[in-house]
From Swiss-Prot:
Residues annotated as the enzyme's active site: 236, 265, 283
Entry keyword annotation includes Oxidoreductase: yes
Organism listed in the record: Staphylococcus haemolyticus (strain JCSC1435)
Pfam families in UniProt: 2-Hacid_dh, 2-Hacid_dh_C
Source domain of life: Bacteria
Gene Ontology molecular function terms on file: NAD binding; oxidoreductase activity, acting on the CH-OH group of donors, NAD or NADP as acceptor
Family: Belongs to the D-isomer specific 2-hydroxyacid dehydrogenase family.
Name of the top EC class for this enzyme: oxidoreductase
Disulfide linkage: none
Annotated positions binding NAD(+): 155-156, 234-236, 260, 283-286
EC numbers: 1.1.1.-
Name of this protein: Putative 2-hydroxyacid dehydrogenase SH0752
Keywords: NAD, Oxidoreductase
Amino acid sequence: MEKVYIAGAIPEVGLNLLKEHFEVEMYEGEGIIDKATLMEGVKDASALISILSTNVDQEVIDSASNLKIIANYGAGFNNVDVKYAREKDIDVTNTPKASTASTAELTFGLVLAVARRIVEGDKLSRTQGFDGWAPLFFRGREVSGKTIGIIGLGEIGSAVAKRAKAFDMDILYTGPHQKKEKEREIGAKYVDLNTLLENADFITINAAYNPDLHHMIDTEQFKLMKSTAYLINAGRGPIVNEEALVKALEDKQIEGAALDVYEFEPEITEGLKSLDNVVITPHIGNATYEARDMMSKIVANDTIKKLNGETPQFIVNK
């Protein structure tokens, strides 16, 4: 019986599917699996279920002589050396679409949280209390009728746009390609990055990471933004130079920021935690029961297909 190694606990629905077909070994230690344990686990495995926080590099891949598939539990896959896996004739898969609704909801939740100062207000109410309603007390910004600029109009970005439409927002987007069908569907307008930054009240990053996008948002980009603008990153941390972000916030170049992903994740750049106009969450974009269960089904089904001689559905390194 072929062995499947899982680099961290996944929901039972996918785990049980795998156990019906294969010998399954799962890392159940605390925290992220260390490299030595990972290499020991995969050395005789036909499949690896990798977690987004697990680095699957050349050394790990070389330690697994029987490996046929790396099924990455996450929509992203920049934690896996996909090119080297292809050289070794190993399929790498991911879990797209399962994260769409959950991450779009979280993105828009961050928009509302930072604009209406919800987290800040919760903290105040719990610690100091307040004297009651007053005309100038604790004002934030309305979202309705404003302009949202979406960096990356993929599945998640499009879902964010649909939610923005319900708030009567004007929708700008940028990316490598204009998507005219999406424009008609959701009423979005394609612009270049600088135009988006200059005009958007809320800038959401929903793009997947690649090296070309590293520090796409840096010192010069913050200078283009409105002083009342908010930056929301629910895509990938390294797209933003967080040192430049902290300075932009401290210098009041922008109004605020909300982050679910970080440049040096899981570390959070010094300065972000101490700023009241920043909302930070621990990478929970798709952390819903529904999304995580669906993701476990996807990695299980693609693993089953591959080890049964079929083509997995979501290969990212064809």
